[in-house]
Structures are given as C-alpha cells and as structure tokens.
C-alpha cells in the first residue's frame, strides 16, 4: 500500500469513528445502531488482505477499548484483530467477492466479533444469550443493511473510474 493509500485508510478510520460517535447515535432505533467500525475493518480487510486487516482491526479495537469505558482492556482489540485477519484471509485465498457475498461476510464478521468479545470478557451463558438476542442480532441486521449500502456506493464509484 502506498503512502497515499495509508493516508486514505487512516482518514477512513477516523471517519468510521466519527460516524460511530455522531451519525450512529442518530441512526439508532430502539437503542440499536449500526457498527461503522466493523464495516471499516471488513472493507479494509477485503480490499487489502489479512495483514492490513489485522493491523487496522487491532488499531480499531484498541481505540474502542480506550475510547469506551470498558473493564476488559484489550477485548475489542483481540476480537477485531481476529475479524480483520479472517476476513482478509478469505479474500486473499478463496475468491474475489461481489456485493452479496461481501454483505454476507460483513454479517458473519459482526457475529464473530461479538462472540469473541463475549468469550474474552467471560460473561455468563445466560447473559450472553440475552445479549445475543437483544443486541447482537438486531445490530448485525442494521450493520449489514448500512454496510450493504456503503459497499454498493463504494463499488459503484470504483467501477466508474
């Protein structure tokens, strides 16, 4: 990745966190909103591969751990690093994905991220089940819808160039 590519990715990183903090609050429905940070990690990993996805996943997760009041410092960093690596591996070694599979990968990545976070923080089984039903599934659906729209806009812009 060139210096311009790193700068562009860093600006996308900052924009994802800004959108998570501002637009994400406006888009909440019944206290459920999209996760722009996961959308960022998946898009970077799909475009640039596992190493870059791992790097930005760790940076985004660590930033979330520091930014949000969390008792388990590092839980987001580990979970998002795993997501960035896994999504990057899928893209590099198997196939180049068009829009519907990318959206499916985004949904799977969201579930993997939440499950690893719950596993790392050591939440009890009944708490995880409740969170899964009340938070993870609705947020995943919302994130997939917003991510699908963003992937469509990005792919449309890319094909016109």
Give the ranges of each region predicted by the language model.
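Terminal, non-globular segments
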Residues: 1-161
